[in-house]
C-alpha cells in the first residue's frame, strides 16, 4: 500500500489574528476572557472529554432577523446554521466571549477548547459573501493571494436541514487556474481533485 499523504495546517497565536483558550464549563451563563485584543470574528469551540459537536460562531452569519451571536453552525456536520443561545445572544468583545448554558460549550466541570480568529490586514480575512451563480472575485485585502480558504454555505436552499460541507483549499495542495484539490472538514473522505471552484487572485480568490 502507498504511504498516506498528510497535510498539517497551523496558526500562530498573535494579537489581532489568532488565539486559543482553554476553559472549564460552569453550566451557567458567563463570559470567558481571551487575549486576541480584538473581537473574534470566528470561534470554534468543543468539549475535550465528552462526545459533542464542534460549535462555530461567525460574525458574517445571519438568519432572517437573527444576529450572528444568536446563531450556531457545526464544523463537523453539513447541517444548516441554526438559532441557538450557545453564545448567550451576546457578541464577543476585544477581551471576552459569552457562553450560554448549552452542553456543547458550557457543561459544568467539563474542559473545553476554543479557537478564535480575526481579520488582520494583509494576513487573514474572516468574512462572508453571497453567491451569484457566476464568476466573482472575493477581495480579502491581500496582495499575493490566499494561502488557505475555508468556505461553508449557511443557508438551506432545499429546506432539508443540509447546507453544505466545510470546504478547504490551500496553496500547498494548489490554488490554481484549473482544478484545485479540496478537503471537507466535516467528512473523512479523500480530497476531491476534479473540481474547479476557486481560482487564484492577488486580492483573495
Residue ranges and their predicted role:
Residues 1-205:
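Surface-exposed molecular-recognition determinants
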